[in-house]
Swiss-Prot record:
Record field: compositional bias (Basic and acidic residues): 10-26
Biased composition (Acidic residues): 82-169
InterPro entries: SPAN-X_fam
Gene designation per UniProt: SPANXN2
Pfam families reported in the protein's UniProt record: SPAN-X
Residue ranges of the region described as Disordered: 1-46, 64-180
Protein name according to UniProt: Sperm protein associated with the nucleus on the X chromosome N2
Superkingdom assignment: Eukaryota
Length: 180
């Protein structure tokens, strides 16, 4: 006479304890599911953070290299003007760089110092270094002959100002040597 009370298919109704236990089991599994994504997020955050640091560091060094290139290009454009000013200065005022050059090379003339301070004269430096023991007249001839070849190799704006300086220094080299 008694018919089991069931929702469908004649199954017995579960006791409230059994249904609560099943919910608890599901709840215990749920925190594990929730924790797993958090752990994976923490790992990815750490990886992303490290990637950001590396990217910033590379970007920062790239800016520094660009700034150095800009500074060098500015120095290259300023150097001809500074060299012209150095020629006009008294020997006492602009002698710090010249003194260093004199100490490092024996028997060099003031023209050699001007050539050493100018950029893009590596061949001239080698020629002048190889003829340290020769007379001053030989050095003047070598540097005036070599400067015409060097100036043709340089860019037009740099070559024009340097050519003027080389011509001035080769014409008045005997006078400049007497001023020291």
């Amino acid at each position: 006479m008694e018919q089991p009370t069931s929702s469908t298919n004649g199954e017995k109704r579960k006791s409230p304890c059994e249904s609560n236990n099943k919910k608890n089991d599901e709840m215990q599994e749920a925190p594990n599911r929730v924790l797993a994504p958090k752990q994976s997020l923490q790992k990815t955050k750490t990886i992303e953070y490290l990637t950001i640091i590396v990217y910033y560091y590379r970007k920062h060094t790239k800016i520094n290299s660009n700034q150095l290139e800009k500074d060098q290009s500015r120095e290259n454009s300023i150097n001809p003007v500074q060299e012209e000013e150095d020629e006009g200065l008294d020997s006492a005022e602009g002698s710090s760089q010249e003194d260093e050059d004199l100490d490092s090379s024996e028997g060099s003339s003031q023209e050699d110092e001007d050539l050493d301070s100018s950029e893009g004269s590596s061949q001239e430096d080698e020629d002048l270094d190889s003829s340290e023991g020769s007379s001053q007249e030989d050095e003047d001839l070598d540097s005036s002959e070599g400067s015409s070849q060097e100036d043709e190799d340089l860019d037009p704006p740099e070559g024009s100002s340097q050519e003027d300086e080389d011509l001035d220094s080769s014409e008045g080299s005997s006078q400049e040597g007497g001023e020291d």
